[in-house]
């Protein structure tokens, strides 16, 4: 009998040694920056827009990580302040460092966005490529940069 302190019962068994597994064929991804607090219509509208733009990129074969699409529902679900840069900028930095480049969605408010500025500065300092995306137009040519 389990005491409950060990965590949940495992659902399945892991077969094989991780070291023996082949790496994923394409691990390259781009960081998708979108405005959030400055977006007209508020942060929920910004979240919806970010998800739509990320979806368009993914459908076009441009692999992206979008912090707003990922972090907004976490903030809402966990009762965290979605506008607190002291929480979210450091939480996003590991993904910025891992990304191959930055794609900035030129949605309303992007030029005033504190987050987009922070992301742009970090990618510029790292010497990583930066592309600008018009709404609804994934930068497919960026794949070959």
Which role fits each region the language model picked out?
Residues 1-145:
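Conserved catalytic or regulatory cores that recognize and/or transform ribose-phosphate-containing ligands
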């Amino acid at each position: 009998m389990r005491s409950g302190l060990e965590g949940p019962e495992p659902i399945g068994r892991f077969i094989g040694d991780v070291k023996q597994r082949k790496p994923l064929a394409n691990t390259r991804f781009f960081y998708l920056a979108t405005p959030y607090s400055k977006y007209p219509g508020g942060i929920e509208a910004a979240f919806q827009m970010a998800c739509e733009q990320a979806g368009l990129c993914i459908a076009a074969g441009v692999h992206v990580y979008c912090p707003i699409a990922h972090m907004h529902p976490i903030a809402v679900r966990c009762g965290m302040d979605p506008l607190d840069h002291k929480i979210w900028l450091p939480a996003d930095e590991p993904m910025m460092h891992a990304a191959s480049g930055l794609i900035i969605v030129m949605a309303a408010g992007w030029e005033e966005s504190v987050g987009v500025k922070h992301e742009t500065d970090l990618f510029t300092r790292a010497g990583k490529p930066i592309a600008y995306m018009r709404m609804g137009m994934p930068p497919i040519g960026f794949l070959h940069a």
